[in-house]
């Protein structure tokens, strides 16, 4: 089953094909930029196009964005989400034949990290770095949702392992550099002033595109809860 709507390329009004497997995703944006809309759209699209995928959600701000996952056993705290993903990685490295996509979505991971003491901070930065460095080979994928994607929050240069990066709204020059590096210098100036639900996406091997995000069809997203009841 396919979702008809995808991100719209504002440069040529073509539909973009967003990678739904073998992807580590970093999604950034200020409050009110459309970051949540983009996140939920990608979740809905991925769930419907990858029915065998196993999704887990952690929201440090404990908001209502992931209400569709309540009572499914797939909405957990940030620490447990990272620990469980690391356990899944270790199991697959040891030969457990699970090869379905395992996707862990960490909303406001930086706030979680900054709330830890020094020892725990290093431990969980290291765990996330391991997932980012090794996970894709074992069908384990990390999505990090944040307002500010500072490199200091990701150990050992692991931020570079995000092969799909999205910035919603009109990001600051600092955020643009953090997300896109030197590639941002090639972006037209009018791509940097965006309305709610508009932004930039970088995909490995493709580069940067100017995008708009469709509004969420909650009926499609709520399919997640029904799928979990069946399985």
Listing of model-derived features with the role each one plays in the protein:
Residues 1, 171-231:
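Phosphate-binding and hydrolysis-coupling loops of NTP-dependent motor/remodeling domains
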């Amino acid at each position: 089953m396919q979702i008809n709507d995808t991100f719209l390329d504002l440069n040529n009004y073509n539909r973009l094909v967003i990678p739904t497997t073998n992807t580590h995703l970093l999604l950034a944006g200020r409050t009110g930029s459309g970051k949540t809309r983009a996140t939920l759209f990608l979740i809905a699209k991925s769930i419907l196009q990858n029915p065998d995928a196993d999704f887990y959600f952690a929201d440090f701000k404990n908001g209502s964005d992931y209400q569709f996952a309540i009572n499914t056993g797939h909405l957990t705290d940030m620490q447990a989400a990272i620990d469980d993903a690391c356990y899944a990685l270790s199991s697959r490295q040891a030969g457990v034949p699970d090869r379905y996509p395992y996707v862990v979505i960490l909303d406001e991971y930086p706030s979680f990290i900054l709330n830890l003491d020094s020892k725990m901070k290093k431990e969980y930065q290291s765990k996330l770095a391991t997932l980012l460095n090794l996970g894709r080979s074992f069908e384990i994928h990390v999505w990090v949702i944040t307002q500010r994607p500072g490199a200091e929050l990701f150990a050992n240069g692991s931020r570079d392992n995000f092969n799909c990066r999205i910035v919603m709204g009109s990001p600051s020059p600092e955020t643009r550099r953090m997300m896109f590096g030197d590639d941002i210098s090639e972006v037209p100036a009018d791509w940097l002033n965006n309305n709610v639900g508009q932004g930039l996406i970088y995909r490995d091997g493709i580069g940067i595109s100017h995008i708009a995000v469709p509004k969420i069809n909650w009926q499609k997203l709520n399919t997640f809860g029904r799928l979990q009841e069946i399985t």
